[in-house]
């Protein structure tokens, strides 16, 4: 691999990192300045007041822009939120097969979320691409109505996320690594949002989800409804209380897809099974996934494993490691990950990846910087353009509201 390519990108990456850190550092410093000024002009609050009504941080005040309306006494509309995310990447790839160096607005989504009649939610978000004029409007992601009479059951109808596999079930706002692993890229459905009907809920320590979705041809709204259907079943049990930790969720996921040539919202997989585990002790934790899939015509069956430990050095600084392995039964069954795929378009049959990264949280998952280096190798037994050996360095700003 040509690691000299990383040195060529140092200036641009340093600029991105310095500008981001300075801008966010000013925000982080603002509460201290405000507190110092307040301390010099007013008497300190009583202990009781400090406990019951802590002063909101600058981040709390800034993020209030997302709450447009709230009135719990209104019998019709109780809350209106402006939801969304902005995610900016700087990616460098240096591989034996070629190089890549780019800025990328990875995700820009926004829309309203309205709570009505106490138990109903209407949510819609669109994805935009500010880097190009055509198409600036990419698609609807969420467009659904949900009825949730309690935490034990919620019925959702419309275009919604389809959460299975460890990282496929994790919002891009909450990923520990800067991007999902190649296991999710190959065995989850990266379109993520599909039209369908689902029922989900939690009755501690159990969680569950069941849904039926359209897998037809994709378009920017709800799809063409001209292909097959697929079903999803999820059952999980949280061992947190038994282990004395924050979270220890063991989940089983199963997807069955009626394969059809028009199914472009999904991967060409008939059966997908995943057993995944999420452990969080507050100080350290682990994400793990063992998944397997039967291919539809034109796609080999494959299986994979992913393990991702993390350690919280402080309340704001976190280090993450990850190992991913994928293997397909036949040649050309494995795709490369997002930025690697822009260097090598071909497929292979065995993939290994190691990742080391760090995250700095300014305001929890709502405002953070992430960076990570991955070293990956793909074998191409067919020798038809899928071989890959290289390193990728991706850093990014993540904002969610």
PLM regions and their residue ranges:
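N-terminal secretory signal peptides that target proteins for export/translocation
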Residues: 1-12
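N-terminal periplasmic/intermembrane-space "pro-region" immediately following the signal or transit peptide
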Residues: 2-3, 26-87, 401
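Generic detector of N-terminal low-structure segments
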Residues: 8, 15-18, 306
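Bacterial N-terminal signal peptides
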Residues: 14-29
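Outer-membrane beta-barrel pore domains
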Residues: 51-56, 94-98, 117, 135, ...
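Short, well-ordered amphipathic alpha-helices
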Residues: 64-67, 231-239, 355-359, 396-398
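Outer membrane beta-barrel
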Residues: 67-218, 227-232, 236-242, 249, ...
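Active-site-proximal beta-alpha loop/turn segments in soluble metabolic enzymes
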Residues: 211-224, 255-262
């Amino acid at each position: 691999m040509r690691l000299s390519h990383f040195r060529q990108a140092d200036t641009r990456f340093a600029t991105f990192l310095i500008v981001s850190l300075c801008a966010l550092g000013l925000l982080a410093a603002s509460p201290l300045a405000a507190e110092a000024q307040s301390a010099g002009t007013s008497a300190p609050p009583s202990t009781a007041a400090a406990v019951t009504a802590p002063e909101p941080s600058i981040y709390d005040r800034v993020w209030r822009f997302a709450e447009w309306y709230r009135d719990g006494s209104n019998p019709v509309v109780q809350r209106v939120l402006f939801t969304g995310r902005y995610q900016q990447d700087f990616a460098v790839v240096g591989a034996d097969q070629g190089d890549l160096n780019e800025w990328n607005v990875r995700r820009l989504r926004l829309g309203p979320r309205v709570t009505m009649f106490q138990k109903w939610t209407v949510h819609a978000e669109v994805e935009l691409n500010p880097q190009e004029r055509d198409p600036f409007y990419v698609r609807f992601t969420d467009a659904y109505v949900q009825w949730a009479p309690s935490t034990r059951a919620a019925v959702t109808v419309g275009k919604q996320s389809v959460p299975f596999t460890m990282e496929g079930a994790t919002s891009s706002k909450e990923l520990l690594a800067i991007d999902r692993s190649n296991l999710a890229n190959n065995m989850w459905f990266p379109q993520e949002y599909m039209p369908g009907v689902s029922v989900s809920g939690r009755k501690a320590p159990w969680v569950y989800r069941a849904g039926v979705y359209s897998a037809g041809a994709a378009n920017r709204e709800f799809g063409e409804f001209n292909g097959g259907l697929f079903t999803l079943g999820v059952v999980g049990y949280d061992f947190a209380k038994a282990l004395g930790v924050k979270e220890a969720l063991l989940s089983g996921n199963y997807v069955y897809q009626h394969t059809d040539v028009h199914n472009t919202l999904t991967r060409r997989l008939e059966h997908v099974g995943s057993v995944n585990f999420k452990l969080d002790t507050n100080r350290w934790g682990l994400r793990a996934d063992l998944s397997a899939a039967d291919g539809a015509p034109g796609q080999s069956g494959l299986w994979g494993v992913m393990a991702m430990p993390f350690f919280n050095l402080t309340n704001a600084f976190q280090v993450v490691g990850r190992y991913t392995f994928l293997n397909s039964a036949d040649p050309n069954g494995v795709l490369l990950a997002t930025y690697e795929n822009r260097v090598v378009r071909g497929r292979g049959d065995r993939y290994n990846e190691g990742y080391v990264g760090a995250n700095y949280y300014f305001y929890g998952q709502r405002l953070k910087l992430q960076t990570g280096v991955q070293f990956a190798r793909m074998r191409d037994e067919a020798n038809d353009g899928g071989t890959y050996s290289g390193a990728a360095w991706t850093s990014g700003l993540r904002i969610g509201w």
